[in-house]
Amino acid sequence: MATSTSPIKLAVLDDYQGIAAPHFEKLKPTFEITIFRDTLLPYNNPATPESVKEELVERLKPFTVISTIRERTPFPGALLEKLPNLKLLQSTGERNLAFDTVAAKKLGILMSGAATLSPTDSAAKKRGPDSTTQHCIALILGIARNLAHDDLAVKNGGWETLLATGLSGKTFGTLGLGRLGFNVAKILHTVFGMKIIAWSSSLTQEAADEKAKAGGLPVLDDDGDKTFKVVSKEELFSTADIVSLHYVLSDRSRGMVGKKDLALMKPSAFFINTSRGPLVIERDLLDVLKAGKIRGAALDVFDLEPLPKDSEWRTYKWGTDGRSHVLLSPHMGFVEEEVMHHWYDETVENVLRWHEGKEVLHSLY
């Protein structure tokens, strides 16, 4: 709770779309609002220069309250220790694995989140798939149907140049069958007629069958095969036409996909990642795609975000000279207009609750 009579310094980070300002107006004049639309490189990434780390500390040091968007700006303990004025760190979503909650608690920094949908929203239960599921499906269709390539070709005076890859009857392999993996698999099975195979380190066939039933799907498909067939990791990579990653990033899962796995993929297969970049050994994936060993990849997440201007993902001419096709988006899986505005509304509510000495919503520890 704040006690100073002078304006409390509040920073809004990572406002890429420039939509935050109207939401925070109601906090004035009690709070002095500073909005940053850019994101500096992560403090805890080995590739981040010391000069950038120092710049980040100097940028954040004056603020008592900081509002962030998901994991765009990580807050490891080493950074938190250099921010003596920080009392409230507000994230969006209901968890943030880029926050060091242990260090924050030790330092007396309150951390809170914002729910994706309002609990009083009567339409919430009627909604279709979440934004990340929709984005994953869009990437799969985009890379399989060559949408970005064809759009550019037509705008530059060209016409038909490539053949699309149909999904019907093909095999979708999901690494992870949690909420997102299940949602994507269900759509591809029911709408596009794809066969589904799944793997995770703890997934059993019994559990996959229960997920199918709970999701309103039969345990067996029309051919008598399991709707969600659990296979080994090796079988998934070697037989799937689309391999899609749906895993939570942890010390255990970091780098879980590497050259040994990617080498098993069929030349006609696609690799999709809408989860987290560090789940994949990025250099191994780059090497496979540069050599054109698979048909292509569609990625929404990367090791280092935002991507540096000189990143090979940006600079290579993908889809030419034997290279695989690559479709990229800038970590947009959760970025929907309604969701973002709701997050800012709830962030402001939490700041007010903190200032008034009330319990904040969605404490992160």
Model-derived features with residue positions:
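N-terminal glycine-/charge-rich "phosphate-binding" loop or analogous flexible N-terminal tail
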Residues: 1-65, 69-70, 205, 213
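Rossmann-like dinucleotide/phosphate-binding beta-alpha-beta segment
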Residues: 23, 161-267
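Phosphate/diphosphate ligand-binding glycine-rich loop within oxidoreductases
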Residues: 61-155, 165
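Short, well-ordered coil/turn residues at beta-beta hairpins
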Residues: 68-69, 92, 239, 245-249, ...
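Rossmann-fold NAD(P) dinucleotide-binding segment
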Residues: 73-86, 252-271
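Residue-level detector of alpha-helix initiation sites
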Residues: 127-131, 158, 179, 334
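Oxidoreductase and adenylate-handling cofactor-binding alpha/beta cores
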Residues: 130-152, 182, 186-194, 346-356
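Rossmann-like dinucleotide-binding domain for NAD(H)/NADP(H)
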Residues: 268-365
